[in-house]
Structures are given as structure tokens and as C-alpha cells.
Amino acid sequence: MKKQIVITAIIALVGSSIHAVSAQQTNVGVNSKAPAKSSNGDVAQSTTVNDPADTAIDVETIEAAMVSAVGLGKPRNNMSSVMIIQKKDPIGQQNLGRDIPFLTQSLTNVITTSDAGNGIGYSGIRVRGSDATRTNITINGVPINDAESQGTFWVNMPDLSSSIGSLSLTKGAGLSTHGAGAFGATLAIGTETNSPEPYYQIDQSVGSYGTLKTTLKGASKPIKLSNKETLYINARLSEILSNGFVDRATSNLVGYQTSIAYEKKSQKPQGQNTNQAGMEQLSEYIKRPKKYNTNTTQIKFLAFGGRETTYQSWWGVPIEKYNMGLNPDSNHLAALQNHYLRNTGFSGATYRNSIDSANLFNSNPNKYNYYTYKNEVDNYQQHHQHLYLTHNYTSKKNNQKQLAATLYHTFGTGYFEQFRYGDAFSKYNIPPIRMAADSNITVLLSASDLVRRRWLRNNLIGVNLHHTISVGKDWWIFGLGANQYYGNHFGQVTQILALPNPSSFKTHEYYRAIGNKSDVNAFVKYNHSLTLGRNNNTRGGVYIDMQLRKVNHVGSGTDNDLRNFDFKGNFLFFNPKAGFQLQHATHHHISGYVGVAHREPARSDFTDNPNGAVPRPERMINGELSYLSTFPALPTLNGKSSDNHIRINAYYMHYKDQLVLTGAVNDVGTPLRKNVDVSYRRGLEFEGQYVLWQKDYAVANHSHFERNYLHLIGNLSVSQNIIPNSKVAWQDYATGIPVDTVYKNAPIAYSPNRVAALGLQGQIKKWNVLWLSKWVGRQFLDNTGDVSRSLNPYKFSELTVNYTHKFRSGTSLAFKAQCINVFSARYVSNGYTWGYMYGSRDITQEVFVFPQAPRNFLVGLTWRFSKG
């Protein structure tokens, strides 16, 4: 029932005091210099090269263990996929209420969008043109993508960013993982780890368009059950309110998270302290692995989720209406009138009454919302429960091992409500209703304005098992996962407004359908470390990753339009992957990767497929070749710095039977797709950082160092995204027969050939500033390459400022502010289209777009009270 959103890519060099430089499909750091510490305890602008000989299991937290098993392999020596990792504090500095996709805008080849226009509500990301169904999302290793639609709906998990310990994103086929697996990008999320001290925190943000965010969170003092056993408890409660930029696009979101964790350690790791480094261990490539001599056991229960009520804004703005905001001249008015005349005056017309007409012609062209009914809302709640177990131990042969298991359950229920104008009862299998016209006359009512609700109720139950073994220079992970999904779709007519007492109408169910899906997968990952060269100055490794996945998906019943359907999809996929990484003389890194990925069709591919075609599963062969150079020392304004780098990545993604977006959407806003025989994406990605100025200084009686700096950061992607033979069927409404047209070398929809970002990132003592400018090339809305059905190139800029003051008592106060779309650029970042013929070969097209807000602001305060 949810509208598809998109989310993908690699976390870029954003945040106040931490960046991890890495190469796609490698896992190497960039500097042997000891890191300076920032005021928030993060590693500031410095990382180190891993020692490939270090293969001990060093993941101490449950969250790190689960992310490591399915997303990274070994965190400090994983040859299979290296990504840039964004840690908690940089996330928090940008977390003023906007959805998670907008925390990732600086990423290479990434596009973000918002239906409401201000980043709250339904939001999404695309990477390399890939949509949400290609992005595998996991939270502590648990699959989050909806099993049927394959998308991820962040609005169902309000303010999840306030509970994140890390985000790690990669592009391409990635690694074996649970759930549907990556088909374009991978996002592995780790939640916050156990707090070593008690605290409570209040976050309050306000901003444009009535935005108000309140977050309360805290942790208890660790409860010592014995010298070896500890109990941890933490919780969060959040509320986000917004009116949206688009008319009536309100959001009322409530989210929560709570956890209780048990930890038993019989001995400290040798040579290390026992501070809770949490998920930071994954991004700080600077510590020797911990060697465990005794057992460590952790058990944790995590619950999170929320409730969302959002007014629908997924219809978009007709392009003729949007153009009126640019220049309301007679030509644009005539175009809008023609659009209106094409879509009114017949059964099922878009514009059904005087309210629709007045709304179309009189509303603000930039903020137009098709929906006017006061309760045209999406009302949904989703609840997740996870139970984790990890056990680290040393075998008799002194091999490091880890067992990990996760049980999980996701429950969701809700509906969206719709007002329908003059609908015939026959559409709902409602017999005519006899009612009194006056005291002597009765009439037979067969049509009326009415209110309906379309429901989704679903459950997902699953288990993940992992066994990790470290033997010398070899590293093994064995994984097994299984889950079962149960979905119920049904619709109800709740009110018939022509009745004297509409609410007296007994709720009538007019359709019901089920969808059940099972997913079983098993994988093995093997890494082998290498040391090469006369002086052993070339290090690296090779890896192989193999997965077998079995999917069974069945659906049957009646759809919203009373069509009966019954589909079955049984798939068996083998997904092998392999690669290498080499590091020479500290400053040169090269890596290569090739992987195969498969993806089954989603529910809507079966139920909404054009012309009744049976969708086929997709296959992708992904190749990546990456070079990373970290310069030993380059001049800055006040000396030299070794924290500069440049990365060049070449990729090729070859598809067989890719399900590409057609540009059209169904009646709940889900993008429609169809198979194309052969297609490909290929491109070059450039990322870099240059240190303009930096200075380290000692604080707190030289107890630690902090770094002031000013960095120039940027990225650029240049790509081709092509369907060699794109066959489009245009419906001819005069004959009722579709007309096939083949477009040669057509660009894949929603896949711009150019995406770039440039920014300045600086920290001066308690102040942190980030300026980011983003450029996005033309996006075609269908697979024809017709400019009239495309989104114009656009650019925007953002400014984020943070100030943090810590008191001796341990209390801290942080001020955060964002200016979004600084220059008030007028642009649209998303849209959809469809076209048809009527007795001739001329194509009549309808294009709808989603405008983004002009200059707007968010400001916030964070009070954190903890032991000093």
C-alpha cells in the first residue's frame, strides 16, 4: 500500500570530525599517522592501514557482530566490499527532523527526493539510477525491505536516525546478506550500542512549514549482576510534526526504540581497554584486533517502530500547472486548460467536480496537491522486535570463533483513506440501496460519493544464524537465514455520503487478497590475506563469496479494481562473488570485484504488469575496479597535511531481464516496471578531499588532542545507462489495441548521466560547518529518451552549522542549524509519466512532477545530561 521510495549508495565524506577514506570493493585505511581526537571522541581526519595478517575476531558488540556477518565480513580486513562509514555524531549533527535519505545527500551518484517537498514524510534516494527495490536494507543484519514490494518506507520508522550507531553503504551487487540481497546498493545500519554510563537527552528542533521534532532518550546506569555480568537498558521516544511544503502534505509521526542487553565477560581482551567503542570499531581502522582468551556472551532484545499519519501527496503536480509558476502567460494557461479538458467529463476522470477544478486553477503552482478531502491520509504503524545472541570463544587450537543468532518479528497494520466522487456501487459489489426521497417516494440509489479505506496487515518472522572462524590468515563466515511473510490486503467502504446518516452504513468489504512469501538463503564467505613484494611492502587479499537463495512467493484474491488474480513465483538463485585488494607502500590501493546478483519480481510486477505479461526474475553481473591514492603530504595554508586523497572507481552493471521503471504509477503511487531483455549501466566515479587548513591543539591538561580543519570535498559521476532496444507499448484508445514502438539506445528512466557535489567542511573548536552544493543531470521519466518527458537538470546548496559546549559536570549543550536550498532554486527531483494514442500516431502525454521547497530553515537544541 505504500508508495515506493528509493534508497541507495556509499556514505560520503560528511560529518564534523570523522571521515573514513576507502575504495569501492576494498577495505583499506589511508594513513599510518596516529589520529587526533575530536571533542566528541571520534577519530578526526586520520585512519590507518590494516595489517592483513591480523585476523582475530574483534567485534565486541552485538550490533557490530550482526552488521559484520551480513554486510562487511571481517571489519578490519574485509576484501569483499569497503565502504565509507558514517558514525553517530555526524548523523546527529544533521538530524533536525528530515528523513534518513536527506542525511546522505553528499554521496557520489546519489539523488534524494521528497513527496511533501521538505524532506519529511515519504522520501527516497536513488543511486546510479537504482530505486528502493534494488537497495537491500538491514538493521543489525535483519532485512527491513518489505517482502512483497521490496521497498523500504522510512516513514514507518520515525526518527530512526536518533538511534543509529552507524550507517555503511556500498554500491553494486555487494556481499551476501539476508533478505532479497542487493541489486544496486546496500545499506547496513547498526543501532546504538550499550552506553557505559547513564544519561538522558532532550532534542528539540523547529523549522519552516510547521516542522517540530521532539526526541527524549536515555540509558540507565549499567547494572552489575556480578563481576562478569552486566545489564544495560536504554530507550527513545520521538515525535515529528510537519505541515509540508506541498499543500496539506502534513505528517504526524511517533517513533520509539527500547533495548535491554545482557553481557558476560570472563576476562578483558588482551592489550585493550573495555570501553564501549560500539559501531565506531567499524570505522576506526586504527586499533590492533583484540585477542580473546576466554568466552564472551551477549544477549540483547531490541524493539523499535512507530506510527505515521501522513496526508497524501503522491499524486504530484501536472507539468502544465507547474509551468504556470514559472511564467503564467496565455500559452501556459492554454496548456493547463488542455490538460484539464483531456482529463475531465468522463467516467473515471481525474477532475470530477468543481472542487477539483477550482483546486487545479486557483492553487499555488509550486504547492498544488490534487487531494482535497480532509482525511485523505495514510495511517500505518509498524513494530519490530529483535532478539540477538553472540558468543565469542577460542578453540583448543587457539582459533578465534564466533556464533551469532537473531530471531526477529515485524508486524504492520494500517490503511489509507480515500474520498470517491460519484462512484458506482457496482465497483464495490454493493447492491442498489432503496432510500426515501420524501414521505411518499423512494428511489433506488446505485452511485454516490463515498469513503473507502484500503488496508494492509502483515507479519514477517525470521531467523539468522552465523558462524565465524579466524584461522591464521584465513577468515570464514558461514551464514543461514530464513523468513516467512504473511500479507493481507483488503478494502472497505466505510461511508456512503448520499445516505441521510452516512456513518450508519455498515462497513462493506469489497476486496481481499493474500500474499505469502518464504525466503531461505545460505552463504559462505572466505577471505585470505596476502603479503607480497621483496620487502613485504604490498599487502592485500583475495576473497570468494557464494550464496544460494530459494524464494517462494504466492498471491491470490481480488484486487482493488475487482480483478481476480492468482500468481506463483518459485525461484532458486546462485549468487557467486569474488575479488581482490592490494595496498602498496601505504599510499596506493587497487581493488577489483565481480559479482552476480538475482532478484525476483515484486508483487506489483505480477498484479500490475502491462498487458498481462508474466514478469521474469532479473540477473545482474557487476564489475568494479577502483584506485585510491592517499598523498603523503601536500601543502595547506599553514603547512602540510597527509589527509588528502582521491578515488577513481569504474563500474559496469550488465542486466538480463532488468525490471525497469516505465515512468507510470499505479493507483497507490507504486512505480510500475517491466522486463527489458538487455540493459546496462557503466560509468566512472570520482571522489576527493583536499585539506585547505588544519591545526591540532591539546586540551584538558593535554589529556587529548582536538583538530581544527577546513576541507574541500567533492565527487563526480559520469555514466551511461542504456537499453539498446526499448520496446514501449502505447495504448490506442480509438482501437483498443496497443501500438509497439522500439527506441534504440534509450536511456534508462531516472538515471542521470551526470551527478556532482562540492563542499566545504570545517571545524574550529566548538564550531562545525558544512557547505554542500549538488548538481543533478537530466532524468528521463520513461525509457524513450524524449526530452518532453524528463526532469530538467537542477542544482541546490545547503549550509549546516553546529556549536557544542561541554560543561565540567558532564552536561553538554549543542546548537544546530540548517539553511536548505540556500538560493531558493526552483526545481523538481522526481516525477512520473504516461502516454497514449487516439486514432493517430501522435502521442498524448501526461507528466507529473514533485517540486522541492525553496529556501527553508531548521534549528535545534540538544541537551545531554550525563556523568562527567
Show where each model-derived region lies.
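Conserved C-terminal beta-signal and adjacent last beta-strands/turns
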Residues: 8-9, 296, 304-308, 375, ...
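N-terminal periplasmic "start-of-domain" segments of outer-membrane beta-barrel proteins
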Residues: 23, 41-54, 59-95, 124
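Extracytoplasmic beta-strand/coil segments of soluble accessory domains associated
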Residues: 101-143
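Short acidic/polar hinge/loop motifs at secondary-structure boundaries
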Residues: 143-171
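Short strand-turn segments of transmembrane beta-barrel domains in outer membranes
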Residues: 171-176, 185-222, 235-249
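Face-selective signature of the C-terminal outer-membrane beta-barrel domain
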Residues: 380-559, 581-593, 638-641, 646-650, ...
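Membrane-embedded beta-barrel scaffold of Gram-negative outer-membrane proteins
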Residues: 392, 402-408, 583, 589-595, ...
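Gram-negative outer-membrane beta-barrel transporters
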Residues: 532, 635-641, 652-654, 672-783, ...
